[in-house]
Design a protein with these regions (language model features):
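Short, Lys/Arg-enriched N-terminal segment that forms or immediately precedes the first helix
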Residues: 6-20
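Short capping segments at the starts of secondary-structure elements
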Residues: 23-25, 37-42
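Basic amphipathic alpha-helical segments that dock to polyanions
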Residues: 58-68
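A short acidic, leucine-rich amphipathic alpha-helix
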Residues: 45-49
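Non-DNA-binding regulatory cores of transcription-related proteins
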Residues: 68-148
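Pre-recognition alpha-helix immediately N-terminal to the DNA-recognition helix
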Residues: 28-33
Length: 148
């Protein structure tokens, strides 16, 4: 296990403990799977990696972790919700979403691009009398596999 993974597990355990919840083996396995997957993952993708996990317990743990803002859903372009750790644990990033198969990959832009995006959002928000609390950029297109 990488040092970063240890740090994430420690932070997750702490957040759950502060809310009176336990970092059970099932929750830890789920966080491990999401860390290993490295991008938003659907329940079928997660179950394929750990077939011994029951689907019902996975959904229950996903709901608990989502309620605690440890993970969140990322909507793709198919019938499967995908889950990933929140930015508190894996850092700020954006998504490339395939409109054909629904796969989602993470990407990071440079600090100067983030500043330009923040500036553009602030300008649009002022015009609309809107308060921006954060942003995420989802780029839609075709993944390499679907372009073939």
């Amino acid at each position: 296990m990488k040092a970063h993974d240890d740090s994430v597990h420690h932070q997750v355990a702490q957040r759950l403990h502060e809310s009176g919840l336990k970092y059970t083996a099932g929750r830890r396995q789920l966080v491990d799977l999401l860390l290993q997957h490295g991008r938003p993952a659907s329940v079928p993708e997660l179950l394929k990696k750990r077939p011994r996990l029951t689907q019902s317990s996975m959904y229950r743990n996903l709901a608990d972790l989502e309620q605690m803002e440890i993970i969140h859903k990322v909507s793709g372009n198919d019938d499967h919700a995908r889950y990933e750790l929140t930015e508190d644990f894996i850092g700020h990033h954006h998504h490339l979403i395939c409109v054909r198969c629904g796969d989602i990959d993470d990407f990071v832009v440079t600090a100067s691009t983030e500043r330009a995006l923040d500036k553009a959002l602030a300008h649009a928000a002022r015009a609309a009398k809107f308060t921006v609390s954060g942003h995420q950029l989802d780029a839609l297109g075709l993944c390499a596999r679907c372009k073939r």
